[in-house]
């Protein structure tokens, strides 16, 4: 399974994440890999940037579409075979209906080479996204692997500092044996940045976050120099993971 390989270029994919506005809703991540039709997906990304209502459906509460970084996942060079959609749903019924009947998502599925579906249960959330918290939940860590989402809006006058440290962050997480997958994603080039990573356990993530020297340097720089105008950090249990070819 590519999710458990530390080199994301082995299978770069389109991610589709769902998370709710209340504690009753369900959360998913779907990743789609494109060997062909990359230009088509790139055009869809561009169309969505200027028309946020392009992808819509009943039961859909929140949606974001991202491009991704190539190579180790944190490169400024785009990975044209990988895109990310983040959404929230009222419940599984609406999500299944969307997957089965929505014309755009069906075309994405049909044009993609493979898809990975992950059901997640967020339990540790700090910060906000465009002024709201779309990951409200009252869960707790269940003892298994976890998926972490980080997101930040980089201040324009801090871009050089941020970009200078991007490669250091990639090397740092790549060298940590607790990380099984990591990928940098972006809503807007450079300005709106996020990451998705999978860890063997919460403790392995904590070991990296609070003990890795390079990571701590970056965190301290970001706080001291106030790189971000908004941040979000989410820890999630992984409830299920399925791959479709």
Each predicted region: which residue ranges?
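Alpha-helix boundary/capping residues
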Residues: 101-103, 212, 222
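Conserved RNP beta-strands of RNA recognition motif
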Residues: 85-87, 195-198
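Short S/T/G/P-rich N-terminal loop/turn motif that feeds into the first structured element of a domain
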Residues: 9-83, 92-98, 109-194, 204-211, ...
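Extended hydrophobic/aromatic segments used for targeting, binding, or gating
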Residues: 207, 214-229
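Tryptophan (W) side chains
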Residues: 2-3
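A common structural junction motif
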Residues: 103-109, 215-217
């Amino acid at each position: 399974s590519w999710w458990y390989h530390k080199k994301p270029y082995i299978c770069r994919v389109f991610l589709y994440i769902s998370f709710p506005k209340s504690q009753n809703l369900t959360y998913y991540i779907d990743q789609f890999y494109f060997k062909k039709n990359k230009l088509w997906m790139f055009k869809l990304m561009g169309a969505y940037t200027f028309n946020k209502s392009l992808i819509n459906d009943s039961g859909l509460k929140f949606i974001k579409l991202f491009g991704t970084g190539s190579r180790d996942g944190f490169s400024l060079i785009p990975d044209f075979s990988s895109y990310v959609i983040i959404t929230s749903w009222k419940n599984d019924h609406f999500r299944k209906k969307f997957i089965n009947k929505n014309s755009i998502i069906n075309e994405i599925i049909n044009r993609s080479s493979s898809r990975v579906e992950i059901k997640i249960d967020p339990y540790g959330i700090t910060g906000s996204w465009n002024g709201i918290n779309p990951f409200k939940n009252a869960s707790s860590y269940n003892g298994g692997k976890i998926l972490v989402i980080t997101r930040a809006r980089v201040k324009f006058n801090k871009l050089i500092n941020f970009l200078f440290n991007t490669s250091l962050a990639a090397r740092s997480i790549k060298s940590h044996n607790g990380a099984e997958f990591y990928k940098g994603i972006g809503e807007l080039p450079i300005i709106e940045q996020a990451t998705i990573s999978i860890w063997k356990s919460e403790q392995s993530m904590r070991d990296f976050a609070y003990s890795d020297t390079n990571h701590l340097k970056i965190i301290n720089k970001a706080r001291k120099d106030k790189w971000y105008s908004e941040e979000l950090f989410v820890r999630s249990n992984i409830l299920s993971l399925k791959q479709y070819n």
